[in-house]
Amino acid sequence: MTACSSPPRGLIILCAGDSLTDSEYPRHLHRLLAREGRRTRVLNGGRKGNTSGEFWRYLKQRGPALAREHPDFVLLQLGTNDVRVDGDHTPADTFANNMRKIIGLFREFTDRRGERARILLATIPPLPERYSFPFGPESAGRVVREINPLIQKIAAEEQLVLVDNYGLFLRSPELLPDVHPSSAGYRLLARNWYDALKPLLPDIEVRPGK
């Protein structure tokens, strides 16, 4: 896990997920928040290649250490690796169960005031028309038919803020040339998270003169 900044006060945001999180977007998100004068620490908790099950196993081990960071917000996006066609293929019901366990553990996290961390849950981007192993045409179909509907259902059941990263890249497919976005795509992804976060941010911790 890496931090984009480490101010003594301000917001703490934990970005959790797979390689789409272990990427450029947390750094871009920090810049967007800093631009408006916020003291913010953005923690990159992305795990390259992780399915929901692998991330759950990681979280069971690393959860206590992450909890000690006392994040105000957790930004969660998982599911892309669950639609692989190799041994990482995850059945829909298993994916849903994994996500509920992950969210349940994150619900135990508290910020420095002792209040529960706010969790934002994102749909996963579409898979492009060019498939490369370990993804295939059936992977793209599962994103649409299974994974994202389950994410939407879980967000509603758990009363979480839902962030539409699927629709984001559906409208800008040129920024998603492969499974991973381009550099411009990661900036767009950070902006989408920022737009979802902004209404939830307190009117505090703004640097004097801003």
Residue ranges, per PLM feature:
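Alpha-helical cap/lid subdomain in secreted, periplasmic
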Residues: 32-35, 57-209
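Serine-esterase "nucleophile elbow" of acetyl-processing enzymes
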Residues: 1-53, 59-70, 188
